């Protein structure tokens, strides 16, 4: 009787502990054609997009929270390091893509780091973006991106949320970004 109680308690503990993993509540997205994969939250829905955006998922309740992957062909670039340091790539991304001067958006690079996984270099960028609007309607957003080069293409996975939601989603979004793999 006592053994059965401990066995049952242990089984319940293992099941509950498994739900506490960093990837709980996430599911895999695999694009074997373009050669990348990542985790995204269960219950998020895929949105129709146009090139160069390859895929977008967003929350069905907090629709402004999203994850996207952009794939661009790059002539003669064999490695991410050839594009510059993490800070240089981050500055160019913000200046030319995220918040070009004519867009009315502003941006600030918060952090830029480099990490290696499976012989690939990934630049991890954290940045803030202010969308246009007057003082009351301008929206502050918080973003994380992972950038990698593989097979003559630059892959950029980005997650984004309103700044006021960032503390709630930060850990999950960091897990999503770190799950991004190109091959």
From Swiss-Prot:
Alphabetic keyword roster: Lipoprotein, Membrane, Metal-binding, Palmitate, Signal, Thylakoid, Zinc
GO biological process: photosynthesis
Gene (UniProt): psbP
Essential cofactor(s): Zn(2+)
Lipidation (S-diacylglycerol cysteine): 20
A Pfam family recorded for this sequence: PsbP
Residues binding Zn(2+) 2, per UniProt: 58, 63, 87, 91
Function in brief: Plays a role in the early stages of photosystem II (PSII) assembly; binds to D2 (psbD) and may facilitate its incorporation into PSII. Present in less than 1% of PSII preparations.
Residue numbers binding Zn(2+) 1: 31, 34, 54, 164
Signal peptide start and end residues: 1-19
Keyword Transmembrane: no
Disulfide bonds: none
Entry's Gene Ontology cellular component terms: extrinsic component of membrane; photosystem II oxygen evolving complex; plasma membrane-derived thylakoid membrane
Name assigned to this protein: CyanoP
Residues reported in the UniProt entry to bind Zn(2+) 3: 142, 163
Subunit structure: Monomer. Present in very small amounts in PSII.
Native organism taxonomy: Bacteria, Bacillati, Cyanobacteriota, Cyanophyceae, Acaryochloridales
More info: Crystallizes with Zn(2+), but it is not known if this is physiologically relevant.
UniProt KW Endoplasmic reticulum keyword: no
Subcellular compartments: Cellular thylakoid membrane
Organism annotation: Thermosynechococcus vestitus (strain NIES-2133 / IAM M-273 / BP-1)
Lipidation residue positions, type N-palmitoyl cysteine: 20
Membrane topology: Lipid-anchor
Similarity section: Belongs to the PsbP family. CyanoP subfamily.
């Amino acid at each position: 009787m006592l053994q059965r109680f401990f066995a049952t308690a242990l089984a319940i503990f293992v099941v509950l502990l498994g739900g506490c993993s960093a990837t709980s509540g996430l599911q895999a997205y695999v694009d074997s054609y373009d050669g990348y994969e990542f985790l995204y939250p269960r219950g998020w829905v895929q949105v129709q997009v146009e090139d160069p955006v390859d895929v977008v998922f967003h929350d069905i309740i907090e629709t402004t929270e999203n994850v996207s992957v952009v794939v661009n062909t790059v002539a003669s670039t064999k490695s991410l390091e050839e594009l510059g340091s993490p800070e240089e790539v981050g500055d160019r991304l913000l200046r030319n893509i995220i918040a070009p001067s004519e867009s009315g958006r502003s941006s600030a690079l918060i952090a830029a780091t480099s990490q290696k996984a499976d012989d690939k270099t990934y630049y991890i960028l954290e940045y803030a973006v202010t969308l246009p609007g007057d003082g009351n309607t301008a929206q502050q957003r918080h973003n994380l991106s992972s950038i990698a080069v593989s097979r003559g293409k630059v892959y950029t996975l980005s997650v984004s949320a309103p700044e006021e939601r960032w503390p709630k989603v930060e850990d999950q979004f960091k897990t999503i970004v770190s799950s991004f793999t190109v091959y």
